[in-house]
Amino acid sequence: MDLKPAHVVVPAAHITRDEVGELFERKGISKEIGNHDPTYLTQWARYSLRQEFIEAEAGMTGCNFGVAATGDCVVCTNEGNADMSTSIPKLHIVSMGIDKVVPNYESLAVFQRLLIRSATGQPSVAFTSQFRKARPGGEMHVILVDNGRSDIIANPVHWRTAKCIRCGACMNTCPVYRRSMGYSYSYFIP
């Protein structure tokens, strides 16, 4: 299966459970041919991923928000994979756009609620993790990505685009996007 992501928050939203089941069968991940039950597939995905996390020398995560006052990196997930990436390997690498920085915890609380409710409609996510330093005996490196963001923020016409928190709400309400899952556009991220 060689598909591009279809959504900024739920990249595999366009893949059916049967397609996932067939992929797991081809890759040897699931053991029961034809069982495409989501709970069964989730269990095998966890088992398979756990083995990879245990053997990894480094884990890499994104960062939903960086808190300027404390230096914390905040990661919100529903699966908990970020915690596996940060707690098992000795090296944790965080990649974060400079537009993800919020001033303090009061601002974080506002943006976190906005992100979660706008992205999936949930009152909260299953996992919110905060990292300020490496785990004992480990290393943590934070990569701040500018990639033209400074120019956008400085531009009097385009600076508002830097306010996007990548929640996907605009995608969820767009009639074209709901039909095409982003494939009508050249890129799936707004």
Task: Specify the residue positions occupied by each region the protein language model found.
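Iron-sulfur-associated redox domains of electron-transfer enzymes in respiratory
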Residues: M1-A154
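Short, well-ordered loop/turn and helix-capping segments at boundaries between secondary-structure elements
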Residues: L114-R117, V176-S180
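Ferredoxin-type iron-sulfur electron-transfer modules in oxidoreductases and energy-metabolism complexes
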Residues: R135-T161, Y177-P190
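Short cysteine clusters
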Residues: C164-C170, C174
